[in-house]
Curated annotation (Swiss-Prot):
Linker protein which helps to recruit the Rho GTPase-activating protein, pac-1, to adherens junctions. GO terms for cellular component: adherens junction. Belongs to the CCDC85 family. The keyword Coiled coil applies. Residues 503-525 have a biased composition (Polar residues). This is PAC-1 interacting and coiled-coil domain-containing protein 1. Interacts with pac-1 and jac-1. The gene is picc-1. Its main location: other.
Amino acid sequence: MIITTPRRANMSSESGSSASTVHYAKPVLRHVPMPSSTTPSSIGSSSSSSSSYASSTKQTPPRSPVIRYPTVVVSKNSIATPSSSLTPQGTPSYAVPVSRNQMQYSASKLQYEHMRHRCKMLDDENQKLMRMQSDVVNDANRRVQMHVNEIRMLKEDNRKLAISNKELRDLSCFLDDDRQKTRKLAREWQKFGRYTSSLMKQEVDSYHQKMVSIEEKLCTKEREVDELRQLCMYLDEQRQSLMSNAAANVDCDNESEDLGCGSSEQSGGSEGHNDEEKHHEFNKCFNKHKESTLRRIMATSMCSEPSEEEERREVSKRERSRLLGYIQSLENRIKHLEMSQNHESFWNSSSNVGSDCDEKTIIERGWLGEEVMSNSEDCHLELKPVMTTSSTSSSHIFGNDKCPMFDSMTSNMTSSGCTTYASSGTDGDSVFVIGDEIDIGNLEVRTLSRIDEEATSASDTLKESARMPPKIAPPICSSLVLTNFDNMSEDCAPRLMRSASETCRPTTTLISSTQPAQRSVSVEKNNNNNVHTHN
């Protein structure tokens, strides 16, 4: 009989090594008929049965895990067959001890022993399987723990990446906003640049036009300045020629007075001849082209724009006020010097020779006396002055309206306009030399050099006059009236008081200029002889 046990059975472990319950299947008992004698037929039948069982076992595939259980072959014969022939292929065979008295052992007892041994083996196998299962479970738990840790790490990395992704998204949004703002700002700057470039182009064009106009005006001003310079030179020549003519007239008058008694016809003829010569020389000294240019300039100045005329008037008013202040200061200084020098008298010569020191004011003569003495031998004048004999000093009238004479107190108060040499009442002569009377604003201040004296005592007189100014008498009724001074009214015309010599009588000199082309002079002499000169 063959007893086969399945893989599992339901029983409790007797050894007590494991407290767990293991379920096993019930054993299957198979009866194998065995012949009474060992015949070849019986052997063949047994071998065939074993081979059939082996084939049946071979046909069924093994399960995983493959566990093979031992089989026990129990035979009633006394002769035991070899295990290799009775057991299937690949299954171990176990020898069950059988007593010699075969009748004593029953089938149930053999089954019990077999079951007991089998249960012990199954328990060991179960323990082995439990150990294997625990190892597998531990390994699975270890792997699960490793995977859990890996998942945790991946989650942490994912969280960090999400945070960095959010930061990058915010940064990209910020950069995009900044880019949009920059683009808007760039467009605004581009518009502003276009506007400024167009504005700068307009400004450059306007300034270029202004520069061109200013250059044109500068060229015209330069031409006008050249013309005015030439005209000034021409006027200076006219003044010098008129002064020389006046000196010649004075000499002729003196000669006519000496030859007047007893020869009236001869003196009359000589006077007519002299007048013709003077008129001819007077016409020679005039240049028609320059005179026409001068008239044109005066006409254009009269027809100038009202704004320029107003500016010119304001400038002339300021200059006039400065001129009046300067003249008043000079008068105050003159009064002070008169009061301080009344007790001194050293000017006792019978004649007064005109010089450049005489054409200066008293203050300037006191300040520049030493300089005139040092330079008296070096400087010369081209024309000779008008000389009059007198026991007192000469009085000079200067008119100028230029700014340079206010800048320096040592400038010569002379002009190209008028110069008067007045003598005392001893000889009864008075000479007035008139130049080119133009508008006062157009007069030029210039420094005159020393005049060469004709008298023998000129150098002595110059040194003496440079050391100390002459004695001045108290102010009298002599006055200088300037009319048509920028169209001023007569009540606003300045009346300047002057001081004359001790023996000089009241003398009035009137200079009137109503038009630029007209010149009028009236001189009242002390000897009741009126001399009128009209140019």
